[in-house]
Amino acid sequence: MTAPTTRKDLMIVNMGPQHPSMHGVLRLIVTLDGEDVVDCEPILGYLHRGMEKIAENRTIIQYLPYVTRWDYLATMFTEAITINGPEQLGNIQVPKRASYIRVIMLELSRIASHLLWLGPFMADIGAQTPFFYIFRERELIYDLFEAATGMRMMHNFFRIGGVAADLPYGWINKCLDFCDYFLTGVAEYQKLITRNPLFLERVEGVGIIGGDEALNWGLSGPMLRASGIEWDLRKVDHYESYDEFDWQVQWQREGDSLARYLVRISEMTESIKIIQQALEGIPGGPYENLEIRRFDRLKDPEWNAFEYRFISKKPSPTFELSKQELYVRVEAPKGELGIFLIGDQSVFPWRWKIRPPGFINLQILPQLVKRMKLADIMTILGSIDIIMGEVDR
């Protein structure tokens, strides 16, 4: 009788691009030794649409509808970065009311993004209930967005010098009611998930990143803060009106998937804190800076002459980008979202380089999944929080 032989060959498995846990068209070529991951190679580019090249032959106002297609779950941040760059190049002052409205919208968008991270992340590791729960709160946020901007997603709401429209009557009270309700929702999530032994078994000690390692890989956002680095661009860069509110940077030391979950859950309650303060202290005044004289134009142009530039909804395509370069960044839900902008005394940018947080955070995935089990790939990938529209651009 022949003795049974055990095969020692490695197995190569394709995960994606059509896979429910890939969060978009990501493809992983995984090399397995039984259940153990030997190697993992991400294949990107299935959703590449040439966003940087498109920007080079569009005015800023023409390009705004495109940018909401990068990270389509946190569109306010892509709009914010698109108008912050030209505002800094043109030295344009934003009215205080507009700045407060922007902060409110950005933080609501952060909560919506974190909610739609939490649901699929829990579904990936086998918990279906939170996946359905998160849509209750997310729908309420989208109702607020629809009332203020006219759109549930892809809002096209930010403008150079302010926002497209003022908050409608009764919106502030509606938003305050949502804030009170949402805090009970977060408490429910924590009760349901945080101490659940099955959940802890799947995430504790999985995908550990040390602080130095996170810095060396260029990680940002919750990925960096979960590794013990207290770094948040809202505190560091002092953009918009974040300095006027009382809030804390949320961070953890452990650097594993559980730490990344805890950072994002805590960030949602901090965002509510910021929104409540902004709603209660929102000043009066204009919501858009309509009359900006260009500083590099003639000294006293005629009122209706071509040199007098309005930076507003209607004539803003004539807004020229001065001949200088600038890197501008915001703290998006997934990390540091930045653009490197070069103006050329033209209405079109000469170069528009996008720094997407998801793309850079994803680079550490092969290192994290090596020597882990096949099932841990979903946990680790889910904890990174990627959107392929932003990764591929």
Swiss-Prot record:
GO terms for molecular function: NAD binding; oxidoreductase activity, acting on NAD(P)H, quinone or similar compound as acceptor; quinone binding. The keyword NADP applies. It catalyses: a plastoquinone + NADH + (n+1) H(+)(in) = a plastoquinol + NAD(+) + n H(+)(out); a plastoquinone + NADPH + (n+1) H(+)(in) = a plastoquinol + NADP(+) + n H(+)(out). Gene3D superfamilies: Cytochrome-c3 Hydrogenase, chain B (1.10.645.10). It is found in: Plastid, Chloroplast thylakoid membrane. Keywords: Chloroplast, Membrane, NAD, NADP, Plastid, Plastoquinone, Quinone, Thylakoid, Translocase, Transport. One of its GO terms (cellular component) is chloroplast thylakoid membrane. GO terms for biological process: photosynthesis, light reaction. Its main location: plastid. Its EC number is 7.1.1.-. It is a peripheral membrane protein. It holds the Pfam family Complex1_49kDa. It is an enzyme of class 7 (translocase). The keyword Plastid applies. Belongs to the complex I 49 kDa subunit family. NDH shuttles electrons from NAD(P)H:plastoquinone, via FMN and iron-sulfur (Fe-S) centers, to quinones in the photosynthetic chain and possibly in a chloroplast respiratory chain. The immediate electron acceptor for the enzyme in this species is believed to be plastoquinone. Couples the redox reaction to proton translocation, and thus conserves the redox energy in a proton gradient. NDH is composed of at least 16 different subunits, 5 of which are encoded in the nucleus. This is NAD(P)H-quinone oxidoreductase subunit H, chloroplastic. The lineage of its organism: Eukaryota, Viridiplantae, Streptophyta, Embryophyta, Tracheophyta. The gene is ndhH.
